[in-house]
Amino acid sequence: VGLKDSYLYAFDFSLAPISKPVKMNNIFFEFGKWTLTAASEQGLNELVKLLNDNPNITIELSAHTDLVGNDADNKTLSLRRAQSVVDYLINHGIDSQRLTPVGYGEEKPVVVDEALHKQYPYLPKDQVLDEAFITTLSVDKQEVCNSLNRRTEFRVLKTTYNLY
């Protein structure tokens, strides 16, 4: 068709890994319980929308606790919290086959990233917020670390649900 030359174009861009957990900052539970608070509704509805907009993904929904209490109770509490979020999603039309609840208890403490270090300069970058570190801090800083460890996250497990 009259073409004499060919060109090769190279693009360099970064793509965030889909398996990296996404922290949901606006999911809240009653103290020591797995009951979702009314303040969680907006965040939960955003997750429903995300899942409806992406019907081929499956996710792991994980809940984490702080160091307060014993390990077994924290593991049970976190699993019940993850299940509460999953139940909400199912009640809002998301297929249960796309959702895997996991309770990690205090097994996976937060690792301080650059953003957390900037927000809390006393937390060194790459520091694991585990018991050994937290107990070296003042009481008010311990509570900050405990609150950071109490979290709900999701990560994408598959992007091929119902495609084949």
PLM segments and residue spans:
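Periplasmic peptidoglycan-binding/tethering modules of Gram-negative envelope proteins
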Residues: 1-58, 97, 119-122, 141-148, ...
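Conserved phosphate/oxyanion-binding catalytic-loop motifs
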Residues: 61
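Periplasmic OmpA-like peptidoglycan-binding domain that tethers envelope proteins to the cell wall
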Residues: 64-164
